Amino acid sequence: MLSLKTLLCTLLTVSSVIANPVPARDPSSIQFVHEENKKRYYDYDNGALGEPIRGVNIGGWLVLEPYITPSLFEAFRTNDNNDDGIPVDEYHYCQYLGNDLAKSRLQSHWSTFYQEQDFANIASQGFNLVRIPIGYWAFATLDNDPYVTGLQESYLDQAIGWARNNSLKVWVDLHGAAGSQNGFDNSGLRDSYEFLEDSNLAVTTKALNYILKKYSAEEYLDTVIGIELINEPLGPVLDMDKMKNDYLLPAYEYLRNTIESNQIIIMHDAFQQFNYWDDFMTETDGYWGVTIDHHHYQVFDSSQLESSMDEHIQVACQWGTGVLDEAHWTVCGEFAAALTDCTKWVNSVGFGARYDGSWVNGDETSTYIGSCANNDDITSWSDQRKENTRRYVEAQLDAFEMRGGWIIWCYKTESSLEWDVQRLMYNGLFPQPLTDRQYPNQCNTTSS
């Protein structure tokens, strides 16, 4: 999940290929199948699964996000008037505590925030996949990194086992790069954009290659059906040519030519417009098993927050139609039920909310749209707000199922309502079963 989407407007265009890619193999349990002008689907068991990806993100677990687990960060609070002294990300969390204390607190968090029962619940609720974010620092670090390292991998392995036990599939998502790929707090290091600096790129590539080699091995392919090369690279501020040529293409070559794996790779769209990636790593150029991951929110810009409900629905449906003619198989790997940015720290520590006019980020401010009071208390929600939230969720599900499916952000939080699938389901704001529709055909589609 991100917080600075108003920056995202620039487009770059480039096309390049590597020599002699490994040819596509026959369809198997890790190949995508498609027919012209039809939705692509995942072939889990040497036959069509018959449904799109319907997944949840395991957010705030192996990569900290203050709004998901605020108690970890509230421990640093020194006054009630502002967030001064509270670390803004995992980098500073570990730096402030020192390695030993950070390790103790993080191990406690990793051991308790998710349990196998959560994965059993996810499966029983009809989901078929979990996307698990993890940072580069779990596998490799820079010399001066304060991160706790080397321990997250065992928790990831445990989670993959939980998924297997409950017939869930997994995307392993490299969520944070050395130097940060986007400057968001969820990259591990806020306000930095140095991912493509040579030493940072080398460490990130080392971590990625480890992930690719391990989780593309035969023992994992029954469960791990995709590896995301990097989450949300901020294309408008990065050198896209360098990212493609020095990171994405080498990753593909390493996967196909060095370790000779037919694992699926996931590429985030880098906040580029639909069809931007249509001439990069395409089937016609000999590439295969490449998926584009789009992320969609409507709460990180004041104009979006001011939209009418019909406008929100229209935009959501356009997210679905926008990918119908994209060259790659596509999934919406992040979206949410949220229609406000009221959840504390969802915009990052210290920034406030645009919705109630408390947003301050340098010279940027916002004007009042509505109150954020009691935002996480469902008893304070009007019937209209509940209806709007359910409408918005259903429209997004229908839109994303026009192609490969969806993975909602995220399964649970400590206290948020708008960002917590468990709470949304409990309060009837997220469909159960997942195909149930109180507001059918909002995108002129039919419910399955």
From Swiss-Prot:
It is found in: Secreted. Disulfide bonds join 317-443, 342-372. It comes from the Eukaryota. It catalyses: Successive hydrolysis of beta-D-glucose units from the non-reducing ends of (1->3)-beta-D-glucans, releasing alpha-glucose. The active site is at residues 232, 334. GO terms for cellular component: cell surface; extracellular region. It is an enzyme of class 3 (hydrolase). PROSITE patterns: GLYCOSYL_HYDROL_F5. Residues 20-40 form a propeptide. The keyword Lipoprotein does not apply. The keyword Disulfide bond applies. Its main location: secreted. Its EC number is 3.2.1.58. Residues 1-19 form the signal peptide. InterPro entries: Glyco_hydro_5 (IPR001547), Glyco_hydro_5_CS (IPR018087), Glycoside_hydrolase_SF (IPR017853), Glycosyl_hydrolase_5 (IPR050386). GO terms for molecular function: glucan exo-1,3-beta-glucosidase activity. Keywords: Cell wall biogenesis/degradation, Disulfide bond, Glycosidase, Hydrolase, Secreted, Signal, Zymogen. One of its GO terms (biological process) is glucan catabolic process. Beta-glucanases participate in the metabolism of beta-glucan, the main structural component of the cell wall. It could also function biosynthetically as a transglycosylase. Belongs to the glycosyl hydrolase 5 (cellulase A) family. This is Glucan 1,3-beta-glucosidase. It comes from Saccharomyces uvarum (strain ATCC 76518 / CBS 7001 / CLIB 283 / NBRC 10550 / MCYC 623 / NCYC 2669 / NRRL Y-11845) (Yeast). The lineage of its organism: Eukaryota, Fungi, Dikarya, Ascomycota, Saccharomycotina.
